A protein has these predicted regions:
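A short, well-structured juxtamembrane/interface segment
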Residues: 2-18
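Glycine-rich phosphate/pyrophosphate-binding loop shared by adenosine-nucleotide-utilizing enzymes
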Residues: 297-302, 340
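Catalytic core of membrane glycerolipid acyltransferases/transacylases, capturing the structured
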Residues: 19-72
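Secondary-structure boundary elements
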Residues: 40-44, 83-90, 121-126, 268, ...
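Acyl-donor binding region in acyl/amide transferases
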Residues: 273, 309-397
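Conserved N-terminal entry element of GNAT/NAT acetyltransferase domains
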Residues: 212-249
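Non-catalytic C-terminal accessory region of glycerolipid acyltransferases
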Residues: 44, 75-223
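Short amphipathic alpha-helix that is part of the acyltransferase structural core
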Residues: 234-278, 284, 288, 292, ...
Length: 397
């Protein structure tokens, strides 16, 4: 039986390609426990394990058999691993390839093989680190010191002598594959750093790699449609998409979905907060221009509007989002009357290449038409570092 906390459960992605990487303290029970844990969240998981474990009839289809002793694996095996991941599925890998032994009076894995890194980079899959707590019996470690192959014969005994005991499992935050590129470090060195990162989970210490939290789940479409329908209708597009002006004074389904989609979109261009959603204090009193597909009950994109006449900012206040980014000097007070701060816009990736951004600007035009006292539109613009510097210099006045 295993024990796991709520945060660890939240760190298990429910969909999409992913490689789970774990230490290997027990040699059998740990693999079965992690497999049971991950399969309780998603049914598409497979585990890389010794070819002999494929003979366990009830769960043989959940294994991809590899030869841990010689490390001589066929092209077909490697291809099946890559195909499984590229099909947006999950896989569990123990890079040590064998059970932990004692070293310097500590139970820890030996050197890690770097195959999991090659799979991650080849498939552009994120890695989710898992630390498994536990030890085998003193007899096992004594046998390991005397005769390493002999100790392997004791693993069957170790599998059954832990009845009524709990295995502690900690699942860390996801590591995007881009964060595995550490300049001049070799794959072997990066694999060793990943090993240290995973052992840091034991004490909840800060890890080595930059991580991302798993996005919150998508909000209920019916709840979204209901909340958006209570907003102010600004119009409809030619293809019948609705444009609404909405308020979110609490962490409602609409605000949570806006925060989720913002983070999803910004991550897609190498940005984002790395948190479960992108929401700040301004979202609770700003308004949101939402482009909504009423038929599919789905948000296509949104803009955030700060209505200055409602917010009543002052030069030295931080009531506006832009006041946290820029210093408003004397003479800029004119923006604080009859003005609208625009920002935090997004079109979720699946709608890139459509007219969604044009529709959002049509929505802004509809707002100005409905509220003709509006004189100033202003706000910040993020320019991705992915643009070459000469291009950025041309954009910035």
């Amino acid at each position: 039986t295993y024990k796991i906390d709520k945060i660890s459960l939240e760190n298990i992605p429910k969909t999409g390609r992913v490689i789970f990487v774990a230490n290997h303290p027990l040699g059998g029970l740990d693999g079965l426990s992690v497999l049971r844990l991950i399969s309780s969240v998603r049914t598409d998981v497979k585990i890389l394990a010794n070819v002999y474990l494929k003979k366990i009839e009830p769960i043989k289809d959940m294994f991809i058999g590899i030869d841990n002793l010689t490390n001589l694996n066929t092209k077909e095996t490697l291809k099946s691993i890559i195909t499984h991941i590229e099909n947006e599925k999950a896989i569990i890998i123990f890079p040590a390839g064998e059970v932990s032994r004692t070293k310097n009076f500590k139970v820890q894995d030996g050197a890690w093989r770097d195959g999991f890194l090659k799979f991650a980079k080849k498939t552009r899959a994120p890695i989710v680190p898992i630390f498994i707590g536990g030890k085998n019996s003193p007899l096992f470690y004594l046998a390991s010191m005397i005769n390493r192959p002999l100790s392997g014969l004791l693993l069957g005994h170790e599998l059954f002598n832990k009845r009524d005991k709990f295995i502690n499992i900690k699942v860390g935050e996801m590591i995007p594959y881009e964060n595995l590129n550490l300049g001049d470090f070799s794959n072997a060195e990066v694999a060793n750093l990943m090993k240290k990162h995973i052992y840091s989970l034991k004490k909840d210490s800060k890890g080595i790699f930059k991580t991302q939290q798993i996005l919150i789940k998508a909000q209920d479409p019916n709840a979204l449609a209901d909340e958006i329908s209570r907003g102010e209708k600004l119009g409809f597009t030619r293809d019948n998409k609705g444009i609404y002006l909405c308020e979110t004074k609490e962490y409602s389904p609409l605000l949570l979905e806006l925060g989720r989609l913002r983070e999803l979109t910004f991550r897609s261009v190498g940005e984002g907060t790395n948190r479960r959603y992108d929401i700040d204090k301004f979202d609770l009193y700003y308004k949101h221009l939402v482009l909504f597909d009423d038929e599919k009950r789905e948000i296509i994109g949104a803009y955030r509007l700060g209505i200055t006449d409602e917010i009543a900012p002052e030069i030295n206040s931080e009531k506006l989002y832009t006041q946290t980014l820029f210093d408003y000097g004397a003479g800029s007070e004119f923006l604080f009357s009859n003005g609208v701060e625009l920002g935090r816009s997004f079109v979720q990736p699946k709608f890139w290449g459509s007219r969604a951004l044009d529709y959002l600007w049509i929505g802004i035009g509809a707002y100005v038409k409905k509220y003709p006292s509006t004189r100033y539109l202003f706000g910040p613009v993020s320019i991705s570092v992915s643009y070459p510097r000469p291009a950025r210099n041309l954009i910035i006045y």
